[in-house]
Structures are given as C-alpha cells and as structure tokens.
Design a protein with these regions (language model features):
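Short, well-structured N-terminal submotif of metal-dependent ribonuclease cores
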Residues: 1-40, 55-62, 68
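Alpha-helix capping/helix-boundary segments
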Residues: 8, 44, 83, 102-103, ...
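Acidic, PIN/NYN-like endoribonuclease modules and their adjacent C-terminal/linker elements
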Residues: 1, 104-131
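Acidic catalytic patch
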Residues: 16, 42-44, 65-93
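Histidine- and aromatic-rich ligand-binding microenvironments
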Residues: 5, 41, 96-97, 119-120
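Short active-site oxyanion
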Residues: 35-38, 75, 111-114
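A mid-sequence interfacial segment
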Residues: 83-113
Length: 131
C-alpha cells in the first residue's frame, strides 16, 4: 500500500496542472496494476476537502460526491472508512463543516459520550455539546 499526500490527491482530482496530474495518475495506476491499494489518511482527506472548497470553490454536493467516490473505489483505502461514511451521512443535512462531522463520528467510535465545542454550528450536531 502507498500513502499519498494532499497535493497528489488534489492534482489527481482537479487536473489543473497537466504535468502533475499525469504524474499522479501514472503513480496511482502503477500501484493498482501491481495489486496494491492507495491509502488516504484522514488528515489528507480533511485537507483535500478544505482545499477543494476554499481554493477551487467546489460546492458541498460535489464534495459529498467526491468523497463518496473515494470510499467506493476498490483500489483506495481510506483511514477508518466507517467514520468517514458516518461523517458524510451527517454532513449531508448539517450546516457544520465536514471536519466537525468527522470529529464527532471519530469521537463517538472511540466511546466519547459527547464532544464539547465552542463552534455554534457543530454544537447543533448529534453527539456535540456547547462548551
């Protein structure tokens, strides 16, 4: 398995730099053709979501679709996929950020009875409590 950094994933998804896109695609194809999966940890996933939303202006619906496609890709392994799936489910109808949804999902999976926050939007999510 080969882990990838945010810039490789963003270049692969956005394709705005053809040289880097081709390098990323070649690297990913090589791994897959050798029977290996590509690993995306949650820090990379969160940073990618932030970059695509803030720098490229991708709408939430496109982000939901993009992350769902990564989850469904047989050659990609996301860190703690059940937490990512839960976060996506929550995020669909929430005003909070994806990061907050993932924080809540992860904390719940680790047995936390609640997540305390100063974030008004996040405090409205199930499993969160306002500080």
């Amino acid at each position: 398995m080969l882990g990838i950094d945010t810039n490789v994933l963003v270049r692969f998804l956005v394709r705005d730099d053809q040289t880097q896109f081709k390098k990323a695609r070649k690297l990913l194809k090589r791994e897959v053709s050798n029977g290996r999966r590509v690993f995306i940890n949650q820090l990379v996933l969160l940073e990618t979501e932030w970059v695509l939303r803030s720098r490229y202006g991708l709408a939430k619906t496109l982000m939901l679709d993009t992350i769902s496609r990564l989850l469904d890709a047989p050659d990609i392994q996301l860190e703690d996929e059940p937490a990512v799936e839960e976060a996506l489910f929550i995020w669909r109808d929430a005003n909070a950020d994806f990061a907050d949804c993932l924080i809540g999902a992860r904390n719940g999976r680790f047995g936390c009875r609640a997540t305390v926050t100063f974030d008004t939007k996040a405090s409205k999510l199930s499993g969160f409590t306002a500080a």
